[in-house]
Amino acid sequence: MAKSKDVRVTITLECISCDRNNSDKRFPGVSRYTTRKNQRNTPTRLELKKFCPYCSEHTIHRELKK
């Protein structure tokens, strides 16, 4: 039997420092990651520190609104 409601949803994480100061960088663009989260355990918006290839450092990536 399949469950009626899926608890895990697919989300997109976006770098918060790329869009602000991207004019002096080598490559234009915004770093994005896709992942899944459990809505029951994490009802708030997710923030993770991930590597951004455009900034060439580890930065905070925030969950995008759907």
Curated annotation (Swiss-Prot):
One of its GO terms (cellular component) is ribosome. GO terms for biological process: translation. It comes from the Eukaryota. Keywords: Chloroplast, Plastid, Ribonucleoprotein, Ribosomal protein. Pfam families: Ribosomal_L33. GO terms for molecular function: structural constituent of ribosome. InterPro entries: Ribosomal_bL33, Ribosomal_bL33_CS, Ribosomal_bL33_sf, Ribosomal_zn-bd. Gene3D superfamilies: Ribosomal protein L33. It is found in: Plastid, Chloroplast. NCBIfam families: PRK00504.1, PRK00595.1, rpmG_bact. Belongs to the bacterial ribosomal protein bL33 family. This is Large ribosomal subunit protein bL33c. It comes from Angiopteris evecta (Mule's foot fern). The gene is rpl33.
